[in-house]
């Protein structure tokens, strides 16, 4: 396929893509990773999460993953820093009774000391001192992060040989 044809395809796909939060269902079946992860982040959380526990999701995106956990809304809190997602969370999470607050995961969290049993963070920034501060004694922090080598082949296809973004 010629470069112009590819660009035309990408432009058509971009014009119909409706990205809200972290919902990328519009690319379902069009892109797959070469290897599956050797763990299931959702299952790990659900192994620890009990209905009576207070849960905080830092950098929730649009809240899609958080809602998939089906945790009691009155025991659920979330933060997000990206302005379009903040608005989306206000429209979707607040009406459900979820305690949503705008805030950046790497800064001071807008919650009291020792408030949460479980804090989760999927691919977002976080401040370990703040997580320690808001977790109850014996609380659990569960995170899934992206490494410098993730999708390296795709990065090099698009950008050529580049330095790793971090060690």
Enumerate the language-model features and the residues they cover:
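Residues lining the SAM
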Residues: 117, 122, 144
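N-terminal, positively charged/glycine-rich alpha-helical extensions of SAM-dependent methyltransferases
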Residues: 1-26
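Conserved class I S-adenosyl-L-methionine
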Residues: 140-167
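A short acidic, Gly/Pro-enriched loop at the edge of an enzyme's catalytic core
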Residues: 108-118
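Conserved alpha-helix/loop element of class I SAM-dependent methyltransferases that forms part
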Residues: 24, 32-54, 64-65
């Amino acid at each position: 396929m010629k470069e112009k044809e590819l660009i035309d395809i990408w432009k058509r796909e971009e014009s119909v893509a409706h990205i809200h939060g972290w919902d990328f269902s519009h690319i379902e079946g069009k892109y797959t990773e070469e290897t599956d992860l050797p763990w299931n982040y959702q299952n790990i959380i659900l192994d620890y999460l009990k209905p009576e526990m207070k849960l905080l999701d830092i950098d929730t995106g649009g809240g899609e993953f958080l809602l998939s956990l089906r945790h009691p809304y009155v025991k659920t809190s979330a933060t997000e820093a990206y302005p379009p997602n903040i608005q989306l969370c206000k429209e979707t999470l607040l009406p459900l009774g979820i305690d949503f607050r705008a805030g950046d995961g790497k800064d001071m969290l807008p919650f009291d000391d020792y408030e949460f049993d479980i804090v989760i963070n999927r691919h977002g920034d976080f401040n370990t001192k703040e997580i320690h501060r808001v977790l109850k004694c014996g609380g659990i922090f569960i995170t899934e992060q992206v490494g410098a080598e993730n999708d390296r082949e795709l990065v090099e296809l698009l950008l050529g040989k580049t330095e790793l973004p971090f060690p």
